[in-house]
A protein has these predicted regions:
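Conserved GNAT acetyl-CoA-binding A-motif
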Residues: 89-101
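Conserved catalytic-core motifs of GNAT/GCN5-like acyltransferases
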Residues: 97-98, 115-126
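Helix-loop element at the rim of GNAT/NAT acetyltransferase active sites that forms part
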Residues: 9-24
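Conserved acetyl-CoA-binding loop-helix of GNAT-fold acetyltransferases
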Residues: 74-88, 103-111
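Short glycine-aromatic motifs
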Residues: 40-41, 113-115
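A short beta-loop-alpha structural element at the N-terminal edge
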Residues: 1-9
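Long, contiguous binding/interaction regions
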Residues: 56-59, 85, 97, 108
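Acetyl-CoA-dependent GNAT
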Residues: 24-71
């Protein structure tokens, strides 16, 4: 399985109601195009031993995101990956753009020193 397939499998585990970037699950072709065209500052697969367990990324706006396979959440892997990622990257500021109903992510980022700074609203015009 290549990284795009792995990322798609992770995406399918996410809850649509708490995911800020997807309101519905894209199909495989949409996902593949997304992976190909989005050039993040950094986008890494998280490995434990020889197994892929999640991904972590940093956008051009210094927004950080992380997702760990649901079967492996709450074992400390995400926190370790986040701390290593930030240390390796060396930025002075990171943003975590989190859906306000995603309490797990709010708690996770708060535990790692992130503080709430704003609420963002959007309006879509058709």
């Amino acid at each position: 399985m290549d990284d795009a397939e792995f990322l798609f499998d992770l995406l399918k585990q996410r809850e649509g109601t708490v995911n800020i970037s997807h309101k519905s699950l894209p199909d495989w072709e949409e996902h593949l195009q997304y992976v190909k065209k989005h050039d993040y500052q950094l986008w890494d697969i998280i490995w434990v031993e020889n197994t892929r367990i999640g991904n972590i990324y940093l956008t051009k706006n210094d927004e950080i995101g992380i997702f760990i396979d649901k079967k492996l959440q709450f074992h400390g892997y995400g926190g370790k990956a986040l701390e290593e990622f930030m240390k390796k990257n060396g930025k002075k500021r990171y943003l975590a753009n989190i859906n306000p109903t995603n309490y797990k992510s709010i708690q996770f980022f708060g535990k790692h020193g992130f503080t709430h700074i704003q609420n963002t609203y959007h309006k879509k015009i058709n």
